[in-house]
């Protein structure tokens, strides 16, 4: 903890002083790219992906050998406002399903040869109801960010982050509204299937929460504390830890992007090592990506969460790295280069 004793101070300092890009590694990748047996630029965005990998790993021949999906699960007091068709007990039940191998993310990890870790964030203790009180105090929020930083402890060279938490699209919408303005209608979507009266209650909850905490919302970390959730705080911590350790990150959908948005609002360069795996069918996600100037890799109409979109995108990143490292040059293959 910093000398001032305030838990957020260390994170503010970290966010201000993040390691920058390795432009030498990026340059080396781009120089090799034009020598490979293909017309220049013909692999399109794959060529940009491998340059991004080099930039943030510092490796001139980037590889992805230990990709990991980290799924963070949290519960939210605001679900007491009857904003979702599923009870909060489903969060713990889905964590058990992940452990048993029965969820969509398990199958995608098997198909794409990805590691999977699931983090249960005090599910028996939901965060505060954001329409009545702050989600967390500063100590809890900072400690949860620090816990999220441990996601990379076992070693990985590509981190995919996702989440599970009944009610957390409401939380993500409140964060987006607080950070980027607009109206609740701009950010609130159906989530797990809220329609009709449920949707109206969800909209009302977001409006009420942002109005209640307005005096604190000039500071992005205070936005996280007042309106966030444990899984969102942990994802923000994981993104920061990955940056410190030169690990590129693939962010999943709307809720995971809300965690990235907190860091972006504090320092737009804080998420330069992040790629966004897909754009969710949750309507606020496309707007959120646009606010951060990010282009998703995939658009498959998905809105499940669990890290599924990030995990699917990981295979594209793996393929980009292999194309760069494994392809022969024109000289090696005896193929005539373009004039």
Curated annotation (Swiss-Prot):
Source superkingdom: Bacteria
Pathway: Nucleoside biosynthesis; alpha-ribazole biosynthesis; alpha-ribazole from 5,6-dimethylbenzimidazole: step 1/2
Gene3D superfamilies: 1.10.1610.10, 3.40.50.10210
Record's keyword annotation contains Manganese: no
Reaction it catalyzes: 5,6-dimethylbenzimidazole + nicotinate beta-D-ribonucleotide = alpha-ribazole 5'-phosphate + nicotinate + H(+)
Any one GO molecular-function label of the UniProt entry: nicotinate-nucleotide-dimethylbenzimidazole phosphoribosyltransferase activity
Catalytic residues of the enzyme: 306
NCBIfam families membership: cobT_DBIPRT, PRK00105.1
Protein name: Nicotinate-nucleotide--dimethylbenzimidazole phosphoribosyltransferase
Species name: Brucella abortus (strain 2308)
Gene: cobT
């Amino acid at each position: 903890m910093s000398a001032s004793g305030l838990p957020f101070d260390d994170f503010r300092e970290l966010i201000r002083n993040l390691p920058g890009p390795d432009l030498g590694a990026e340059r080396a990748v781009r120089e090799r790219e034009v020598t490979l047996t293909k017309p220049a630029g013909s692999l399109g965005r794959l060529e940009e992906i491998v340059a991004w990998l080099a930039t943030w790993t510092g490796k001139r021949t980037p590889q992805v050998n230990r990709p990991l999906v980290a799924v963070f699960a949290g519960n939210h007091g605001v679900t007491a406002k009857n904003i979702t068709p599923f009870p909060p007990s489903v969060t713990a039940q889905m964590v058990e399903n992940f452990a048993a191998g029965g969820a969509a993310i398990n199958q995608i990890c098997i198909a794409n040869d990805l590691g999977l870790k699931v983090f249960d964030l005090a599910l028996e203790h939901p965060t505060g109801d954001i329409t009545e009180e702050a989600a967390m105090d500063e100590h809890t929020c900072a400690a949860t960010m620090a816990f999220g930083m441990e996601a990379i402890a076992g070693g990985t060279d590509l981190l995919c982050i996702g989440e599970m938490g009944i009610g957390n699209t409401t939380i993500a919408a409140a964060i987006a509204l607080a950070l980027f303005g607009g109206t609740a209608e701009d950010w609130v979507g159906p989530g797990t299937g809220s329609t009709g009266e449920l949707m109206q209650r969800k909209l009302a909850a977001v409006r009420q929460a942002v109005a209640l905490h307005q005096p604190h919302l000039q500071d992005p970390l205070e936005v996280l504390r007042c309106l966030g959730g444990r899984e969102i705080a942990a994802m923000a911590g994981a993104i920061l830890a990955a940056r410190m350790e030169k690990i590129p990150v693939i962010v999943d959908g709307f809720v995971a992007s809300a965690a990235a948005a907190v860091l972006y609002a504090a320092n737009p360069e804080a998420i330069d090592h992040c790629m966004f795996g897909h754009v969710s069918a949750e309507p606020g996600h496309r707007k959120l990506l646009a606010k951060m100037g990010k282009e998703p890799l995939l658009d498959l109409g998905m809105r499940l969460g669990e890290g599924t979109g990030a995990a699917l995108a990981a295979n594209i990143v793996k393929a980009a790295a292999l194309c760069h490292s494994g392809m022969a040059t024109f000289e090696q293959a005896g193929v005539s280069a373009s004039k």
